Amino acid sequence: MSPNEDPSDSNSRSNAFKGVAFVARYMGEKLPVTVTVILPTRNEEEALAPTIDAIPRGWCKNLEIMIVDGNSSDRTREIALEKKIRVHLEDRKGYGRAYRTGFDVAKNDIIVTMDADCTYPAELVPTLVKRLLDDDLDFITCDRLSLAEEGSMPGIHGFGNWALSFTARILFGYGIKDSQSGMWVFRKSIFDNEAMRPTNDGMPLSEEMKILARRVLGKNKAVEISVPYRPRVGEAEIHTWGDGWKNFKFLFARRVGLHRTRTPWGSRDSNPDSTNGDLPEQA
């Protein structure tokens, strides 16, 4: 996907942080959109509160922050409720499954995604949404590799991300730097076209989203922007070798049309949600 640049100026690394200044000095009318930020969670009690606190408030017509929780056994859901954000429980396993549910139940026009581990620059959410609107885009994915901070992607993780992104470029011919990024900004309406709905319930959903965005939306509507990436807070749920191998296999399966959908699109009516008042106590 192209162009690849930071939110302000592709010639300056420091300008990636101008989103903070944008929020601080933003005194005009609110952006005329409603926004849902989706955080998939499983045992993120250490990082969830600072992740939520880092998301700016008051810059759009309505901001919904929601976790889609995969049966956390720590205080993740309790912390979310203390922070007065929406909690949607999804007991079907998988990173992709959490997002395929969250995309369906999100209430607002624009969706922003990121991990609940303090790695992504939550302070840039308003800047990225404004970029989506100003440039009449449908989808933004955020490249972590160009501006990754020291210690944020050590050893095999950095090599694995590079190898998977290189493979995706070769197989699909799309100029994307970071096929595994989990920070995206897009219009919920893209899913009105069923061809844009991802099928994978696991980690490969991340690369699938970018493949579909370029294929369905086109290079003028789907772009990649570089953002800072920071060391995570808390223990990672990802399994480096196992998830890497699944991502690699999925790229080839997608390329030849052998991928398959294991679960239906969207949430189940039985999924507990804090807005419905039927969320069970934390396990």
Residue ranges and their predicted role:
Residues T34-T36, E64, E208:
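Cell-envelope/extracellular polymer assembly enzymes that use nucleotide-activated donors
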Residues I111:
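Short aromatic/hydrophobic "clamp" motif used to bind/position activated sugar donors
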Residues D115-Y120:
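The conserved acidic donor/metal-binding loop of glycosyltransferases
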Residues K18-Y26, N43-R57:
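Short, well-formed alpha-helical segments that are part of the catalytic scaffolds
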Residues D69-R77:
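A conserved acidic beta->alpha catalytic loop
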Residues E44-A47, S72, Y95, P121:
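Donor nucleotide-sugar binding loop of glycosyltransferases
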Residues D91-V105, A122-M203, P231-G242, F248:
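Acceptor/aglycone-binding surface of glycosyltransferases and processive sugar-polymer synthases
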Residues M1-P32, G173-Y174, R197-A283:
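Hydrophobic helical membrane-anchoring modules
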